Amino acid sequence: MANYYTDIPELKFHLNNPMMKRICELKERNYRDKDEFDYAPLDFEDAVDSYDKVLEITGEITGEIIAPNAEGVDEEGPHCANGRVEYASGTKQNLDAMVKAGLNGMTMPRRFGGLNFPITPYTMCAEIVAAADAGFGNIWSLQDCIETLYEFGNADQHSRFIPRVCQGETMSMDLTEPDAGSDLQAVMLKATYSEKDGCWLLNGVKRFITNGDANLHLVLARSEEGTRDGRGLSMFIYDKNEGGVNVRRIENKLGIHGSPTCELVYKNAKAELCGDRKLGLIKYVMALMNGARLGIAAQSVGLSQAAYNEGLAYAKDRKQFGKAIIEFPAVYDMLAIMKGKLDAGRALLYQTSRYVDIYKALDDIARERKLTPEERQEQKKYAKLADSFTPLAKGMNSEYANQNAYDCIQIHGGSGFMMEYACQRIYRDARITSIYEGTTQLQTVAAIRYVTNGSYIATIREFEAIPCSPEMEPLMSRLKKMADKFEASTNAVKEVQDQELLDFTARKLVEMAADIIMCHLLIQDASKSSELFSKSAHVYLNYAEAEVEKHSNFIENFDKEDLAFYKK
Protein backbone atom coordinates (compact mmCIF):
# COMPACT_ATOMS: atom_id res chain seq x y z
CA MET A 1 0.00 0.00 0.00
CA ALA A 2 1.07 3.59 -0.60
CA ASN A 3 2.53 5.64 2.23
CA TYR A 4 1.71 9.29 1.62
CA TYR A 5 4.77 10.42 3.60
CA THR A 6 7.60 8.07 2.69
CA ASP A 7 6.55 8.11 -0.97
CA ILE A 8 7.26 11.88 -1.09
CA PRO A 9 10.96 12.41 -0.21
CA GLU A 10 10.51 16.18 -0.54
CA LEU A 11 8.59 16.16 2.76
CA LYS A 12 11.46 14.64 4.72
CA PHE A 13 13.78 17.19 3.10
CA HIS A 14 11.68 20.05 4.45
CA LEU A 15 11.40 18.37 7.85
CA ASN A 16 15.19 18.45 8.11
CA ASN A 17 15.53 22.16 7.34
CA PRO A 18 18.24 23.82 9.51
CA MET A 19 15.66 26.21 11.03
CA MET A 20 14.05 23.22 12.75
CA LYS A 21 16.82 23.16 15.36
CA ARG A 22 15.84 26.59 16.68
CA ILE A 23 12.16 25.75 16.39
CA CYS A 24 12.60 22.61 18.50
CA GLU A 25 14.65 24.46 21.13
CA LEU A 26 11.88 27.00 21.54
CA LYS A 27 8.94 24.59 21.34
CA GLU A 28 10.52 22.11 23.75
CA ARG A 29 11.93 24.79 26.09
CA ASN A 30 15.31 23.09 25.83
CA TYR A 31 13.64 19.65 26.24
CA ARG A 32 12.38 20.19 29.78
CA ASP A 33 9.46 17.72 29.40
CA LYS A 34 11.74 14.68 29.19
CA ASP A 35 11.67 14.13 32.95
CA GLU A 36 7.86 14.25 33.17
CA PHE A 37 6.65 12.54 29.97
CA ASP A 38 8.25 9.35 28.70
CA TYR A 39 7.36 10.22 25.10
CA ALA A 40 8.97 13.67 25.24
CA PRO A 41 12.19 14.04 23.20
CA LEU A 42 15.60 14.10 24.84
CA ASP A 43 17.23 16.38 22.27
CA PHE A 44 16.87 17.78 18.76
CA GLU A 45 17.64 14.51 16.97
CA ASP A 46 15.12 12.68 19.14
CA ALA A 47 12.48 15.34 18.41
CA VAL A 48 12.92 15.15 14.64
CA ASP A 49 12.89 11.36 14.83
CA SER A 50 9.57 11.58 16.68
CA TYR A 51 8.11 13.89 14.02
CA ASP A 52 9.35 11.54 11.32
CA LYS A 53 7.71 8.51 12.95
CA VAL A 54 4.37 10.30 13.40
CA LEU A 55 4.47 11.50 9.80
CA GLU A 56 5.11 7.93 8.69
CA ILE A 57 2.10 6.74 10.71
CA THR A 58 -0.01 9.51 9.19
CA GLY A 59 1.18 8.53 5.73
CA GLU A 60 0.32 4.90 6.40
CA ILE A 61 -3.20 5.64 7.67
CA THR A 62 -3.74 7.96 4.74
CA GLY A 63 -2.60 5.35 2.22
CA GLU A 64 -4.37 2.37 3.76
CA ILE A 65 -7.63 3.91 5.04
CA ILE A 66 -8.31 7.51 4.01
CA ALA A 67 -7.39 7.23 0.32
CA PRO A 68 -9.36 3.99 -0.29
CA ASN A 69 -12.37 5.57 1.44
CA ALA A 70 -12.22 8.83 -0.52
CA GLU A 71 -14.40 7.85 -3.46
CA GLY A 72 -17.12 6.38 -1.25
CA VAL A 73 -17.09 9.40 1.04
CA ASP A 74 -17.37 11.69 -1.99
CA GLU A 75 -20.42 9.78 -3.23
CA GLU A 76 -22.16 9.29 0.13
CA GLY A 77 -21.37 12.55 1.89
CA PRO A 78 -22.71 13.51 5.32
CA HIS A 79 -26.41 13.46 6.23
CA CYS A 80 -28.54 15.88 8.23
CA ALA A 81 -31.45 14.68 10.39
CA ASN A 82 -33.18 16.31 13.37
CA GLY A 83 -30.72 19.17 13.44
CA ARG A 84 -27.65 16.95 13.66
CA VAL A 85 -24.98 15.81 11.19
CA GLU A 86 -24.01 12.22 10.59
CA TYR A 87 -20.73 11.75 8.76
CA ALA A 88 -20.34 9.38 5.82
CA SER A 89 -19.36 5.88 6.94
CA GLY A 90 -15.86 6.26 5.49
CA THR A 91 -15.39 9.54 7.35
CA LYS A 92 -16.21 7.79 10.62
CA GLN A 93 -13.57 5.15 9.86
CA ASN A 94 -11.04 7.86 9.03
CA LEU A 95 -11.68 9.76 12.26
CA ASP A 96 -11.52 6.58 14.31
CA ALA A 97 -8.15 5.67 12.81
CA MET A 98 -6.71 9.13 13.45
CA VAL A 99 -7.95 9.20 17.04
CA LYS A 100 -6.59 5.71 17.78
CA ALA A 101 -3.21 6.81 16.40
CA GLY A 102 -3.20 9.81 18.74
CA LEU A 103 -3.15 12.35 15.91
CA ASN A 104 -5.28 14.99 17.61
CA GLY A 105 -4.26 18.10 19.50
CA MET A 106 -0.88 17.64 17.86
CA THR A 107 0.47 21.11 18.61
CA MET A 108 -0.90 21.30 22.15
CA PRO A 109 1.33 20.93 25.25
CA ARG A 110 1.76 17.46 26.68
CA ARG A 111 0.14 18.45 29.98
CA PHE A 112 -3.17 18.63 28.10
CA GLY A 113 -2.63 15.33 26.28
CA GLY A 114 -1.13 16.83 23.13
CA LEU A 115 2.05 15.93 21.27
CA ASN A 116 3.62 19.41 21.56
CA PHE A 117 4.51 19.34 17.86
CA PRO A 118 5.66 22.47 16.07
CA ILE A 119 3.31 23.77 13.40
CA THR A 120 5.63 22.61 10.59
CA PRO A 121 5.34 18.81 11.05
CA TYR A 122 1.63 19.23 11.87
CA THR A 123 1.19 21.13 8.60
CA MET A 124 2.93 18.27 6.81
CA CYS A 125 0.35 15.89 8.27
CA ALA A 126 -2.39 18.20 6.98
CA GLU A 127 -0.86 18.18 3.50
CA ILE A 128 -0.62 14.38 3.53
CA VAL A 129 -4.26 13.90 4.56
CA ALA A 130 -5.52 16.46 2.02
CA ALA A 131 -3.69 14.66 -0.79
CA ALA A 132 -5.97 11.67 -0.19
CA ASP A 133 -9.23 13.39 0.77
CA ALA A 134 -9.40 17.18 1.04
CA GLY A 135 -12.89 17.04 2.54
CA PHE A 136 -11.81 14.81 5.40
CA GLY A 137 -8.74 16.99 5.76
CA ASN A 138 -11.06 19.85 6.69
CA ILE A 139 -12.69 17.91 9.52
CA TRP A 140 -9.42 16.61 10.93
CA SER A 141 -7.34 19.77 10.55
CA LEU A 142 -9.90 22.04 12.20
CA GLN A 143 -8.30 20.80 15.41
CA ASP A 144 -5.92 23.73 14.88
CA CYS A 145 -8.70 26.08 16.04
CA ILE A 146 -7.57 25.02 19.50
CA GLU A 147 -4.45 27.14 18.92
CA THR A 148 -6.62 30.26 19.19
CA LEU A 149 -8.28 29.05 22.39
CA TYR A 150 -4.86 28.16 23.81
CA GLU A 151 -3.50 31.57 22.88
CA PHE A 152 -6.38 33.73 24.11
CA GLY A 153 -8.47 31.59 26.47
CA ASN A 154 -7.97 31.46 30.24
CA ALA A 155 -6.46 28.68 32.34
CA ASP A 156 -9.87 27.23 33.24
CA GLN A 157 -10.87 27.04 29.58
CA HIS A 158 -7.53 25.42 28.78
CA SER A 159 -8.10 22.67 31.34
CA ARG A 160 -11.69 21.99 30.24
CA PHE A 161 -11.47 22.18 26.45
CA ILE A 162 -7.95 21.40 25.23
CA PRO A 163 -7.84 17.80 26.59
CA ARG A 164 -11.11 17.06 24.79
CA VAL A 165 -9.64 18.07 21.44
CA CYS A 166 -6.51 16.04 22.19
CA GLN A 167 -8.78 13.04 22.79
CA GLY A 168 -10.40 13.44 19.37
CA GLU A 169 -13.32 15.83 19.71
CA THR A 170 -13.86 18.03 16.66
CA MET A 171 -13.93 21.80 16.21
CA SER A 172 -15.36 24.47 13.94
CA MET A 173 -14.99 28.21 13.54
CA ASP A 174 -18.33 29.93 13.10
CA LEU A 175 -17.66 33.23 11.36
CA THR A 176 -19.65 33.64 8.13
CA GLU A 177 -23.28 34.78 7.99
CA PRO A 178 -25.71 35.29 5.08
CA ASP A 179 -24.81 39.01 4.95
CA ALA A 180 -21.26 38.76 6.29
CA GLY A 181 -18.88 36.82 4.07
CA SER A 182 -15.59 38.52 3.32
CA ASP A 183 -16.90 41.55 5.25
CA LEU A 184 -16.86 40.01 8.72
CA GLN A 185 -17.37 43.34 10.48
CA ALA A 186 -21.00 42.99 9.31
CA VAL A 187 -21.55 39.93 11.57
CA MET A 188 -24.84 40.29 13.48
CA LEU A 189 -25.20 37.02 15.46
CA LYS A 190 -26.24 38.47 18.80
CA ALA A 191 -24.49 37.73 22.09
CA THR A 192 -26.34 38.80 25.24
CA TYR A 193 -25.08 38.24 28.76
CA SER A 194 -27.65 36.51 30.98
CA GLU A 195 -27.30 37.24 34.68
CA LYS A 196 -29.79 34.46 35.36
CA ASP A 197 -27.77 31.80 33.51
CA GLY A 198 -24.37 33.29 34.34
CA CYS A 199 -23.26 33.01 30.72
CA TRP A 200 -23.68 34.52 27.29
CA LEU A 201 -26.61 33.55 25.07
CA LEU A 202 -26.15 33.45 21.29
CA ASN A 203 -28.98 34.04 18.82
CA GLY A 204 -28.92 34.19 15.04
CA VAL A 205 -27.75 32.33 11.96
CA LYS A 206 -24.33 31.26 10.69
CA ARG A 207 -23.78 30.09 7.13
CA PHE A 208 -21.14 28.08 5.24
CA ILE A 209 -19.72 26.67 8.48
CA THR A 210 -17.27 23.85 7.82
CA ASN A 211 -17.88 20.88 10.13
CA GLY A 212 -20.77 22.83 11.58
CA ASP A 213 -21.94 20.15 14.03
CA ALA A 214 -18.57 19.94 15.75
CA ASN A 215 -18.16 19.31 19.48
CA LEU A 216 -16.58 22.71 20.14
CA HIS A 217 -17.15 25.94 18.21
CA LEU A 218 -15.30 29.24 18.18
CA VAL A 219 -18.01 31.79 17.37
CA LEU A 220 -17.77 35.42 16.26
CA ALA A 221 -20.75 37.34 17.64
CA ARG A 222 -21.88 40.90 18.35
CA SER A 223 -21.60 41.51 22.07
CA GLU A 224 -21.88 45.30 22.09
CA GLU A 225 -25.43 46.51 21.59
CA GLY A 226 -25.90 49.34 19.11
CA THR A 227 -22.64 48.70 17.23
CA ARG A 228 -22.33 47.81 13.57
CA ASP A 229 -18.57 47.57 13.05
CA GLY A 230 -15.75 45.23 14.01
CA ARG A 231 -15.25 46.83 17.41
CA GLY A 232 -18.57 45.43 18.61
CA LEU A 233 -17.59 41.80 18.01
CA SER A 234 -16.26 39.26 20.50
CA MET A 235 -15.15 35.64 20.33
CA PHE A 236 -17.11 32.93 22.14
CA ILE A 237 -16.72 29.24 22.88
CA TYR A 238 -19.82 27.13 22.31
CA ASP A 239 -19.91 23.55 23.61
CA LYS A 240 -22.29 21.26 21.71
CA ASN A 241 -23.10 19.51 24.99
CA GLU A 242 -24.92 22.68 26.11
CA GLY A 243 -27.42 22.52 23.23
CA GLY A 244 -29.07 25.47 21.54
CA VAL A 245 -27.54 25.16 18.07
CA ASN A 246 -29.16 23.15 15.29
CA VAL A 247 -28.06 22.40 11.76
CA ARG A 248 -30.72 23.77 9.43
CA ARG A 249 -29.16 22.18 6.37
CA ILE A 250 -25.96 20.85 4.82
CA GLU A 251 -25.01 22.73 1.67
CA ASN A 252 -25.02 20.83 -1.64
CA LYS A 253 -21.51 21.63 -2.84
CA LEU A 254 -19.42 21.21 -5.96
CA GLY A 255 -16.63 19.48 -4.04
CA ILE A 256 -15.18 18.51 -0.64
CA HIS A 257 -18.31 16.39 -0.19
CA GLY A 258 -17.04 14.60 2.90
CA SER A 259 -16.87 17.88 4.81
CA PRO A 260 -20.31 19.03 6.06
CA THR A 261 -20.76 22.72 5.27
CA CYS A 262 -23.67 23.81 7.43
CA GLU A 263 -26.18 26.54 8.06
CA LEU A 264 -26.55 26.85 11.83
CA VAL A 265 -29.39 28.31 13.87
CA TYR A 266 -28.51 29.62 17.33
CA LYS A 267 -31.40 29.86 19.80
CA ASN A 268 -30.29 31.00 23.26
CA ALA A 269 -27.18 28.87 22.89
CA LYS A 270 -25.10 29.08 26.06
CA ALA A 271 -21.53 30.20 25.40
CA GLU A 272 -18.58 31.71 27.20
CA LEU A 273 -16.34 34.59 26.26
CA CYS A 274 -12.90 33.73 24.87
CA GLY A 275 -10.44 36.50 25.70
CA ASP A 276 -11.62 40.10 26.05
CA ARG A 277 -14.75 41.74 24.72
CA LYS A 278 -14.55 43.78 21.51
CA LEU A 279 -11.39 42.00 20.29
CA GLY A 280 -13.16 39.15 18.51
CA LEU A 281 -12.53 40.36 14.97
CA ILE A 282 -9.65 42.77 15.25
CA LYS A 283 -7.41 40.38 17.21
CA TYR A 284 -8.69 36.84 17.70
CA VAL A 285 -10.25 36.16 14.30
CA MET A 286 -7.20 37.57 12.55
CA ALA A 287 -5.04 35.04 14.43
CA LEU A 288 -7.57 32.29 13.71
CA MET A 289 -7.69 33.16 10.02
CA ASN A 290 -3.91 33.25 9.64
CA GLY A 291 -3.76 29.71 11.00
CA ALA A 292 -6.62 28.66 8.73
CA ARG A 293 -4.92 30.21 5.70
CA LEU A 294 -1.77 28.23 6.38
CA GLY A 295 -3.99 25.16 6.63
CA ILE A 296 -5.60 25.86 3.24
CA ALA A 297 -2.14 26.36 1.76
CA ALA A 298 -1.26 22.87 3.02
CA GLN A 299 -4.52 21.47 1.66
CA SER A 300 -3.73 23.09 -1.68
CA VAL A 301 -0.26 21.56 -1.82
CA GLY A 302 -1.79 18.17 -1.03
CA LEU A 303 -4.25 18.58 -3.89
CA SER A 304 -1.46 19.73 -6.21
CA GLN A 305 0.47 16.58 -5.31
CA ALA A 306 -2.59 14.42 -5.93
CA ALA A 307 -3.22 16.07 -9.31
CA TYR A 308 0.41 15.60 -10.33
CA ASN A 309 0.39 11.95 -9.23
CA GLU A 310 -2.76 11.17 -11.23
CA GLY A 311 -1.54 13.03 -14.30
CA LEU A 312 1.88 11.40 -14.22
CA ALA A 313 0.50 7.88 -13.78
CA TYR A 314 -1.98 8.30 -16.63
CA ALA A 315 0.61 9.83 -18.96
CA LYS A 316 2.95 6.89 -18.39
CA ASP A 317 0.20 4.33 -18.95
CA ARG A 318 -1.78 5.86 -21.82
CA LYS A 319 -0.44 5.04 -25.29
CA GLN A 320 -1.25 6.93 -28.49
CA PHE A 321 0.50 6.85 -31.87
CA GLY A 322 2.54 3.89 -30.68
CA LYS A 323 4.06 5.39 -27.53
CA ALA A 324 3.17 6.59 -24.03
CA ILE A 325 1.80 10.13 -24.15
CA ILE A 326 4.38 11.26 -21.57
CA GLU A 327 6.90 11.14 -24.42
CA PHE A 328 5.16 13.96 -26.28
CA PRO A 329 6.56 17.45 -25.54
CA ALA A 330 3.07 18.91 -25.09
CA VAL A 331 2.44 16.45 -22.25
CA TYR A 332 5.82 16.38 -20.51
CA ASP A 333 5.81 20.19 -20.61
CA MET A 334 2.53 20.23 -18.67
CA LEU A 335 3.79 17.67 -16.17
CA ALA A 336 7.07 19.50 -15.61
CA ILE A 337 5.28 22.78 -14.93
CA MET A 338 2.87 21.00 -12.58
CA LYS A 339 5.82 19.59 -10.64
CA GLY A 340 7.56 22.97 -10.65
CA LYS A 341 4.50 24.68 -9.19
CA LEU A 342 4.14 21.87 -6.65
CA ASP A 343 7.74 22.10 -5.46
CA ALA A 344 7.75 25.90 -5.47
CA GLY A 345 4.48 26.09 -3.58
CA ARG A 346 5.59 23.51 -1.04
CA ALA A 347 8.85 25.40 -0.46
CA LEU A 348 6.84 28.57 0.21
CA LEU A 349 4.42 26.71 2.49
CA TYR A 350 7.12 25.31 4.77
CA GLN A 351 9.21 28.47 4.79
CA THR A 352 6.06 30.21 6.02
CA SER A 353 5.29 27.54 8.61
CA ARG A 354 8.83 27.79 9.99
CA TYR A 355 8.46 31.54 10.38
CA VAL A 356 5.14 30.96 12.16
CA ASP A 357 6.73 28.33 14.41
CA ILE A 358 9.44 30.65 15.69
CA TYR A 359 7.27 33.65 16.45
CA LYS A 360 4.44 31.53 17.93
CA ALA A 361 6.87 29.70 20.22
CA LEU A 362 8.33 33.00 21.40
CA ASP A 363 4.79 34.32 21.97
CA ASP A 364 4.11 31.29 24.16
CA ILE A 365 7.36 31.74 26.08
CA ALA A 366 6.43 35.41 26.65
CA ARG A 367 3.36 34.21 28.58
CA GLU A 368 5.69 32.33 30.95
CA ARG A 369 8.49 34.85 31.39
CA LYS A 370 9.86 38.11 30.07
CA LEU A 371 11.67 37.73 26.76
CA THR A 372 15.25 38.88 26.46
CA PRO A 373 15.92 41.84 24.12
CA GLU A 374 17.35 39.38 21.58
CA GLU A 375 14.26 37.18 21.81
CA ARG A 376 11.94 40.18 21.38
CA GLN A 377 13.85 41.18 18.27
CA GLU A 378 13.63 37.60 16.95
CA GLN A 379 9.91 37.48 17.71
CA LYS A 380 9.28 40.75 15.87
CA LYS A 381 11.32 39.65 12.86
CA TYR A 382 9.57 36.31 12.39
CA ALA A 383 6.09 37.67 13.13
CA LYS A 384 6.54 40.16 10.30
CA LEU A 385 7.86 37.47 7.96
CA ALA A 386 4.99 35.13 8.86
CA ASP A 387 2.41 37.86 8.30
CA SER A 388 3.89 38.75 4.92
CA PHE A 389 4.38 35.17 3.70
CA THR A 390 1.02 33.70 4.81
CA PRO A 391 -1.14 35.43 2.14
CA LEU A 392 1.42 34.43 -0.50
CA ALA A 393 1.38 30.79 0.63
CA LYS A 394 -2.41 30.63 0.68
CA GLY A 395 -2.99 32.66 -2.46
CA MET A 396 -0.40 31.07 -4.72
CA ASN A 397 -0.87 27.47 -3.60
CA SER A 398 -4.65 27.62 -3.95
CA GLU A 399 -4.28 28.97 -7.48
CA TYR A 400 -1.66 26.32 -8.30
CA ALA A 401 -3.93 23.57 -6.93
CA ASN A 402 -6.62 24.69 -9.36
CA GLN A 403 -4.19 24.96 -12.26
CA ASN A 404 -2.67 21.54 -11.57
CA ALA A 405 -6.11 19.95 -11.25
CA TYR A 406 -7.09 21.53 -14.59
CA ASP A 407 -3.95 20.22 -16.28
CA CYS A 408 -4.45 16.79 -14.72
CA ILE A 409 -7.82 16.53 -16.47
CA GLN A 410 -6.29 17.82 -19.70
CA ILE A 411 -3.65 15.07 -19.60
CA HIS A 412 -6.44 12.52 -19.19
CA GLY A 413 -8.17 13.86 -22.30
CA GLY A 414 -11.74 12.66 -22.70
CA SER A 415 -11.33 10.21 -19.83
CA GLY A 416 -10.68 13.14 -17.51
CA PHE A 417 -14.19 14.40 -18.18
CA MET A 418 -15.65 11.10 -16.97
CA MET A 419 -16.57 10.53 -13.34
CA GLU A 420 -14.69 7.22 -13.15
CA TYR A 421 -11.30 8.88 -12.68
CA ALA A 422 -10.02 10.52 -9.50
CA CYS A 423 -8.97 13.66 -11.37
CA GLN A 424 -12.58 14.90 -11.47
CA ARG A 425 -12.82 14.78 -7.67
CA ILE A 426 -9.47 16.54 -7.27
CA TYR A 427 -10.67 19.22 -9.71
CA ARG A 428 -13.91 19.75 -7.77
CA ASP A 429 -12.18 19.70 -4.38
CA ALA A 430 -9.49 22.15 -5.46
CA ARG A 431 -11.95 24.80 -6.61
CA ILE A 432 -12.85 25.96 -3.10
CA THR A 433 -9.26 26.52 -1.99
CA SER A 434 -8.99 29.90 -3.71
CA ILE A 435 -12.31 30.98 -2.18
CA TYR A 436 -12.61 30.01 1.48
CA GLU A 437 -10.60 31.46 4.36
CA GLY A 438 -10.21 34.55 2.21
CA THR A 439 -10.37 34.61 -1.58
CA THR A 440 -7.24 35.06 -3.65
CA GLN A 441 -8.33 38.67 -4.08
CA LEU A 442 -8.35 39.13 -0.30
CA GLN A 443 -4.92 37.52 -0.02
CA THR A 444 -3.77 40.21 -2.45
CA VAL A 445 -5.27 42.88 -0.18
CA ALA A 446 -3.35 41.38 2.76
CA ALA A 447 -0.09 41.14 0.80
CA ILE A 448 0.05 44.40 -1.15
CA ARG A 449 1.24 46.47 1.80
CA TYR A 450 4.37 44.34 1.94
CA VAL A 451 4.98 45.26 -1.69
CA THR A 452 4.56 48.98 -1.13
CA ASN A 453 6.47 49.16 2.18
CA GLY A 454 9.45 47.33 0.70
CA SER A 455 9.26 44.18 2.85
CA TYR A 456 9.21 41.72 -0.05
CA ILE A 457 12.03 43.32 -2.00
CA ALA A 458 14.11 43.51 1.20
CA THR A 459 13.57 39.78 1.78
CA ILE A 460 14.41 39.07 -1.85
CA ARG A 461 17.66 41.02 -1.60
CA GLU A 462 18.55 39.06 1.54
CA PHE A 463 17.91 35.84 -0.35
CA GLU A 464 20.24 37.05 -3.12
CA ALA A 465 23.09 37.11 -0.62
CA ILE A 466 22.65 33.41 0.26
CA PRO A 467 25.29 31.31 -1.57
CA CYS A 468 24.00 28.78 -4.08
CA SER A 469 25.57 25.80 -5.84
CA PRO A 470 27.52 26.38 -9.08
CA GLU A 471 24.69 24.66 -10.98
CA MET A 472 22.24 27.27 -9.72
CA GLU A 473 24.40 30.37 -10.34
CA PRO A 474 23.07 31.03 -13.88
CA LEU A 475 19.53 30.89 -12.50
CA MET A 476 20.44 33.27 -9.70
CA SER A 477 21.79 35.76 -12.23
CA ARG A 478 18.48 35.73 -14.11
CA LEU A 479 16.56 35.92 -10.86
CA LYS A 480 18.30 39.14 -9.85
CA LYS A 481 17.12 40.73 -13.11
CA MET A 482 13.58 39.58 -12.31
CA ALA A 483 13.83 41.29 -8.93
CA ASP A 484 14.98 44.50 -10.62
CA LYS A 485 11.87 44.41 -12.83
CA PHE A 486 9.65 43.83 -9.81
CA GLU A 487 11.22 46.76 -7.99
CA ALA A 488 10.85 49.00 -11.05
CA SER A 489 7.19 48.00 -11.49
CA THR A 490 6.49 48.70 -7.82
CA ASN A 491 8.09 52.12 -8.01
CA ALA A 492 6.24 52.95 -11.24
CA VAL A 493 2.87 52.28 -9.61
CA LYS A 494 3.76 54.07 -6.36
CA GLU A 495 4.97 57.18 -8.18
CA VAL A 496 1.51 57.75 -9.69
CA GLN A 497 0.08 58.01 -6.15
CA ASP A 498 -3.33 56.73 -7.18
CA GLN A 499 -5.06 54.23 -4.87
CA GLU A 500 -7.33 52.82 -7.57
CA LEU A 501 -4.36 52.13 -9.83
CA LEU A 502 -2.54 50.42 -6.96
CA ASP A 503 -5.59 48.27 -6.22
CA PHE A 504 -5.93 47.39 -9.91
CA THR A 505 -2.30 46.33 -10.34
CA ALA A 506 -1.94 44.81 -6.85
CA ARG A 507 -2.38 41.18 -7.87
CA LYS A 508 0.25 41.48 -10.59
CA LEU A 509 2.73 43.01 -8.14
CA VAL A 510 1.99 40.42 -5.45
CA GLU A 511 2.37 37.55 -7.93
CA MET A 512 5.70 38.98 -9.12
CA ALA A 513 6.94 39.02 -5.52
CA ALA A 514 5.68 35.49 -4.88
CA ASP A 515 7.19 34.12 -8.10
CA ILE A 516 10.61 35.56 -7.26
CA ILE A 517 10.49 34.39 -3.63
CA MET A 518 9.53 30.86 -4.69
CA CYS A 519 12.37 30.82 -7.23
CA HIS A 520 14.81 31.73 -4.47
CA LEU A 521 13.48 29.02 -2.19
CA LEU A 522 13.74 26.42 -4.96
CA ILE A 523 17.30 27.49 -5.78
CA GLN A 524 18.21 27.15 -2.09
CA ASP A 525 16.61 23.69 -2.00
CA ALA A 526 18.26 22.59 -5.26
CA SER A 527 21.63 23.76 -3.95
CA LYS A 528 21.23 21.29 -1.07
CA SER A 529 19.56 18.48 -3.01
CA SER A 530 20.06 18.68 -6.76
CA GLU A 531 18.50 15.25 -7.21
CA LEU A 532 15.19 16.36 -5.70
CA PHE A 533 14.88 19.93 -6.92
CA SER A 534 17.20 20.79 -9.81
CA LYS A 535 14.68 20.06 -12.56
CA SER A 536 11.92 21.98 -10.81
CA ALA A 537 14.23 24.92 -10.14
CA HIS A 538 15.01 25.22 -13.86
CA VAL A 539 11.44 24.64 -15.01
CA TYR A 540 9.85 26.93 -12.47
CA LEU A 541 12.31 29.76 -13.07
CA ASN A 542 11.56 29.59 -16.81
CA TYR A 543 7.86 29.78 -15.98
CA ALA A 544 8.22 32.53 -13.36
CA GLU A 545 10.52 34.60 -15.55
CA ALA A 546 7.85 34.72 -18.25
CA GLU A 547 5.20 35.62 -15.66
CA VAL A 548 7.30 38.46 -14.23
CA GLU A 549 8.04 39.75 -17.73
CA LYS A 550 4.33 39.66 -18.59
CA HIS A 551 3.32 41.63 -15.48
CA SER A 552 6.21 44.05 -15.90
CA ASN A 553 5.22 44.81 -19.49
CA PHE A 554 1.59 45.32 -18.51
CA ILE A 555 2.45 47.81 -15.76
CA GLU A 556 5.00 49.63 -17.92
CA ASN A 557 2.44 50.19 -20.69
CA PHE A 558 -0.58 50.91 -18.48
CA ASP A 559 -1.79 54.40 -17.56
CA LYS A 560 -4.38 55.15 -14.92
CA GLU A 561 -6.60 56.59 -17.66
CA ASP A 562 -6.79 53.03 -19.04
CA LEU A 563 -8.88 52.03 -16.01
CA ALA A 564 -11.91 53.46 -17.79
CA PHE A 565 -11.73 50.67 -20.38
CA TYR A 566 -12.27 48.05 -17.65
CA LYS A 567 -15.35 49.60 -16.07
CA LYS A 568 -18.95 48.95 -17.00
Which role fits each region the language model picked out?
Residues 59-60, 90-163, 167, 210-212, ...:
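Internal helix-loop-helix
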Residues 154-160, 439, 445-487:
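A structural-propensity feature for long, helix-poor, extended segments
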Residues 454, 466-568:
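C-terminal amphipathic alpha-helical interaction region
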Residues 2-5, 9-10, 17-19, 256, ...:
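Alpha-helix capping/hinge segments and adjacent helical runs
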